[in-house]
Amino acid sequence: MQPFAQKILVVGGNGFLGSAVCRTALARGMKVASISPSGKPWQTPKGHTPAWVHKVEWHQGNALQPQTYAHLLPEVTAVVHTIGTLFEKSGYKSALKDGNVPRFVSSVAAAVAGGGVSANPLERESKRREGSYETLNRDTAVRVCETFLQSEPVVKTDGPRAFIYISAEDCNRPIVPSGYIETKREAEVLIEKMVQENARYRAVYIRPTLIYHPHFRPMITPAAALLDLSATIHSKHPAGFPTPAGLLRTLGSLMPRPVSGRESLVDSPFNSIARVLTVPPIHVDHVAEAVCIAADKSRTDVRGPYGLEAIRELIGWHQKGQKSQQQAGAPV
């Protein structure tokens, strides 16, 4: 084996979160490769190409077709899976990337209402590309993980190689269909089962809340600001004082818990709404930093699910006046 050198493969490295992971990893001295359907380097929303982009190996590949990227895996010490969709086949991503507010609102409204056939051919095409929850959120991750575990490293590592899956906090239902979080949790279960059977690998599940960036995703910023305000208000309310989130949790506790099927993976939608009111959003750079720490060969202690508080603990972020309510790495 060759001398150890940290190198990560980012699945979806030219996307919003994937590009932040690439940039952060380079800043930490790692080598970076990316695969995406287009294979094109990342550009800013205005079409600019920052200097760091030229340091990334950009490859065209399909996560569901291992033959398009399997040759890259022996050289990497960690794989980061960043692709997924919040609304299946809605076309919201292209509208968000283009900054097209009317089309974004229309796409999200259609997805929440149950979809339908759009009269706009561009919107129909973007829907086709964005795919289903099962395909993007679960199947691509499982296929990449399977292929990674089957690869033989050509670099010497001091510990298990890491597979990092971008999952999510359950704080979007029922606005976001339950299929989103269900397929995320299904992917975690399937990946964990594979990794548990192979001591040479470890899996980390990063569970962010709403991810924002004021410049790259300006349409999300107002919502992020409101949710952050809500979380702050809830965290500072007097003990015993009723809050909207508290009422929602009470209602959720009165609902029977599902005992079979995919719904057994999640709790009541009332609890999900309560979390969105109490758990603040997170900057994309903070998520990327947590991912890169998890990918570091020296952090073999980083395993399992990381919710927002655990992510903050991992990156050394401490909220003033509050103690962390969750130990890093504890299930959420």
Region roles according to the model:
Residues 2-31:
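N-terminal Rossmann NAD(P)H-binding glycine-rich loop of SDR-like oxidoreductase domains
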Residues 11, 35, 82, 163-169, ...:
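SDR active-site strand-loop-helix element
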Residues 15-16, 271-332:
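Mid/C-terminal beta-alpha module of Rossmann-like enzyme folds, strongest
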Residues 41-143, 147:
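NAD(P)H-binding glycine-rich loop region in Rossmannoid oxidoreductase-like domains
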Residues 103, 109-115, 122-134, 159-183, ...:
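Catalytic loop of short-chain dehydrogenase/reductase
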Residues 142-150, 169, 177-203:
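Active-site Tyr-X1-5-Lys
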Residues 157-167, 189-219, 238:
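Conserved beta-loop-beta element that borders a ligand/cofactor-binding pocket
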Residues 181-182, 204, 209-269:
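NAD(P)-dependent short-chain dehydrogenase/reductase
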